Amino acid sequence: MAGQFDSEDRGSWYWGRLSRGDAVSLLQGQRHGTFLVRDSGSIPGDFVLSVSESSRVSHYIVNSLGPAGGRRAGGEGPGAPGLNPTRFRIGDQEFDSLPSLLEFYKIHYLDTTTLIEPVSRSRQNSGVILRQEEVEYVRALFDFNGNDDEDLPFKKGDILKIRDKPEEQWWNAEDMDGKRGMIPVPYVEKCRPSSASVSTLTGGNQDSSHPQPLGGPEPGPYAQPSINTPLPNLQNGPFYARVIQKRVPNAYDKTALALEVGELVKVTKINMSGQWEGECNGKRGHFPFTHVRLLDQQNPDEDFS
């Protein structure tokens, strides 16, 4: 299902001069397809489309072009009137306006997601325009007993402090007793704990042991959009995708679909939550859409690269 946001409402998605680190702080942990547009910190007049996708935040450079396709000088903002008409380029695609660019990526994949909704302004108004050094917390969705000595066991409902993200699916965390170890990302959700929990986890105050900023300085590296990958229309029937990331669902969730890299999945339903439904190896269930990549629907059995 395509995003339902109003691309003409610039106030909902344009954040102006926002640092890369602040963009990451706003988008990290948000559902896939949540995005914002900000001014480029390195090239005046250009913009950056920052998007939450695949357990990371990607940044796509959007170049401002003059009427003849040349670079435009100055930074007027996406809605400011200019003396010359301006076009915008992302990857190999060009658009007459930023709203038309956003409309395109409502139904076309950037890399692993389409654009679903702008990040909420309430995160800024409520003081969550997180400082780059602010600690991130997660809440456990399931019990985890740990498989190795380096793992951090926890119980459902536990609040953990994230210290590092060395892998996409495994983060380094600390519990309320000060124990540290690796935790599986699918077992937790981002949260804002009570002040009491924060006090316990931080030893009563914020010290200098904060994680490093999450996005790195501008410029780049910038992601490149994967063009010509439209979101299929299920009115034309189911479509096929190839598994790109293994998934071992929780044993208690009988509706979750287990996935192995390379398997073919028949997608039967797209949900805005990012949980798709489909069939694989004769079994039906739901799975995160970030674990698969769409195939050429005319030749779904061809080797996937």
From Swiss-Prot:
Modified residues (Phosphotyrosine): Y222
One Pfam family from the record: SH2
InterPro entries attached to this UniProt entry: CRK_SH3_C (IPR035458), CRK_SH3_N (IPR035457), SH2 (IPR000980), SH2_dom_sf (IPR036860), SH3-like_dom_sf (IPR036028), SH3_domain (IPR001452), Tyrosine-phos_adapter (IPR051184)
Subcellular location: Cytoplasm; Cell membrane
Region (Disordered): 194-231
CDD domains in UniProt: SH2_CRK_like, SH3_CRK_C, SH3_CRK_N
UniProt-annotated site: Proline switch, residues: P238
Family that this chain belongs to: Belongs to the CRK family.
Protein's name according to its UniProt entry: Adapter molecule crk
Lineage: Eukaryota, Metazoa, Chordata, Craniata, Vertebrata
